Amino acid sequence: MLIVRRPPRRGEWRAAVWLGAAICAAAAVVGAGQSSSQQTADFQRQARATCGSCHAYPPPDILPRGSWRDEFVRMMFIREGRLPPIGPPGLANRSVQLPADMEQVLPFYVSQAPERLSAPDSWPDPAAPSPLTFTRRALSVPGMPGTPAVSHVRLIDLDEDGKLDLLGTDMRQGLVFTGTPGSVTTALAEIASIPHPAHITVADVDKDGVQDLLVAEMGEFFPADHAKGAVIWMRGLAKGKFGAFWLDGWPRVASVDAADFNGDGKPDLAVAAFGWRKTGSVAILENRTDNPSRPSFTTHTIDKRAGSIQLVPIDLNRDGRMDFVTLLAQEHETVLAYINKGTGDFSFEQKVIYAAPHPNWGSSGFELVDLDKDGDVDVLLTHGDTFDDGIVKPYHGIQWLENTGGFPFVEHTLAQMPGVHRAQAADIDGDGDLDIVATALLAGGSDVDETTLPALAWLEQTKPGVFARHTIEMGFPRHATLDLGDLDGDGDIDVVVGNFSVGPAVKSWVDVWVNGRK
């Protein structure tokens, strides 16, 4: 799911004079009798002390040379708890004075950073030979503008007629919508108007046999520290109607799911509240409801840090008690497991599944899946967020975190894919193993030719742990979310993606890609 981290559009201005001065400053610090390598090592130690005190040390080569001063300014405002000046960073930050410790290490970063990041890996043309072909169908909400920000799509048989329905959220127009993607109907229908919904889950919270909806409400489209977010329980009523209960006063809520964590028979609500800089947490709302018309929940804060973008309940260690896995973005860039201690008081033991190598990793989402079919649960992780700085990064991609029986999991990079935002595993080609479908979203405004970047792709598992890349859609990646399922009942897996308008209007809200496997 998508979490916009700041209003996109970084400044294109580059201060060539300042860069030259910074590089010269770095060189000039080398004193008499001190080798260049020794001086560089001293600078690096100082950089680790200054830039590694709040998060993992960011090496200079993760950003181009011209971006580092803007990055330092951004970090300064975060560290000081202040809002940055309004406007393109390159212009707005020009007169900002950095603190002494940052001024001292900035020349090191500028001198060691590349002029430009390396070009992203090239991907096959969609017309290249592939084991599968896909046919696109476009779905939209009648009367709505072509500027959707579809943050989540989910396929589920909501009305229990044996066919998959589509549920989705649009965080710009403020809609929860539904559709029948397997039919000839191209119209999506509004279920509810909610200001900025980010995520939707189906669960029977009151255990009355009728499916309910859980909606994560952000409160505002663009990031800010506030308490305008909400957890919304849309209680299922007769004839497909819903009654909404708002549990408000939250930071920006990124996702919510239901599971019984204390063993009392009532589904509790697990909440990933992304927040922004000062706000945000991971929490469980203990379900104390006796009368569904008067919901009652008690909050148990599990992790007080901001940046949780997704949370999935699961009995990870198979002891009969519900645990959960969450992904902390922001400066943390960590996948965490919270193992239920079984004390009935919502106590968990935190375990690190994976910690990214640096704080600019761009974590964007994960799926829990047994990718190697060895009987345990692995993590399929994507990291491709560009909404902090708009820069297309060659190290963004898809990772398999293999569960080998302990923590952390073992990391395998499966493919590099700029802007990758979501990946899911399924047997797309019908050969018995799991393949991967991935979609990408870029903030726009980069200096990379976006016509050459994949927007939707699939990875064919050709042998255990080895994947061949195939492009379904090329150019202008604008998909924050996807889901997989057999929409037409022909026995193979089709793809549904949500569209996220960045700049020009788009022709549809949701695209269905029908698998043409013979």
Give a label for each model feature:
Residues A25-Q39:
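Bacterial Sec-dependent signal peptides at the C-terminal "C-region" and cleavage site
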Residues A16-A28:
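Bacterial N-terminal signal peptides
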Residues R5, W18, V30-G31, D206, ...:
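N-terminal non-cleavable signal-anchor helices
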Residues M1-E12:
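N-terminal secretory signal peptides that target proteins for export/translocation
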Residues S36-K518:
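Beta-propeller-forming repeat regions
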